Amino acid sequence: MPKVKDTSASSKALNVIIYAVMVFSLLICIIPFIYMVSLSLSSPKAIINNQVRLIPKGINFEAYKQIFTYPNFFRAYGNTIFYAIAGTFIALCMTILFAYPLSKTYLKGQKILMKMVIFSMYFAGGLIPNYLLISSLHLTGTRFAMLIPFAINQFNLIIMVNFFKALPQEIEEAALIDGIGYFSILPRIILPLSTAAIATVGLYYAVFFWNDWFNGLIYLNTKQYPVMLFLRNIVNGTMVLGDSSSASTDTSTLSISIKSAVIITSTLPIIVLYPFLQKYFVKGLTVGSVKG
């Protein structure tokens, strides 16, 4: 009996430590975000006097007004929504269609293909060769430059391959016995069992396409810019918002508010999306890492 009590006591102590670490990690992540929200909603006077903490002082929506009233803001936001949705859909289709045959060990050349995938993870072509390739395909200046070249990510591909490997082979054999054709197994049997991995990989792709601004800077014209590139130009001061005749002090403090509002505006959609996919996220990662 004493040993049971000691085990129980040590288990409780361990749980307390784990919860304390988790709460501390949560605070590290959430406090800066709350502070950014507070800065974006505070008045210039409160910012000048360094009165802003976690609660806004002198509620002021001028920063958001400056961003939302800019002529090209909603066009850029619409571009990003298109890139995120279309890019994620195309990437998932390409990744699944490549990962499923790679998960079959009886496929001729399967090991060579996997080695090529892993090799390309560590030794990429580089910026200039990629630009020359995309330019030779006449994709520069088109929205496809943000979608087609990034349709498959090696890390996401490996997750899907390992997930498909973890599925029992007997399921496919039973489906064939029941009369389901080879071309129907993937959409009718495998994909319904792979929602966790698809949601995980889909979230990775969505975050990538949502945050991608560098490729837009290289390949797109101004009207096709994603919102991240639009907001980056605001933060860097290459795009002027508001009345240029305003006082310098107000301009500097408003700039702080605008930069904070930019952070909130750009990250909020992903933060809102994540809780809906959280239940699939951990499962998809753990199951996708069972086999190598």
Model regions and ranges:
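A hydrophobic, multi-pass inner-membrane permease signature
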Residues: 2-292
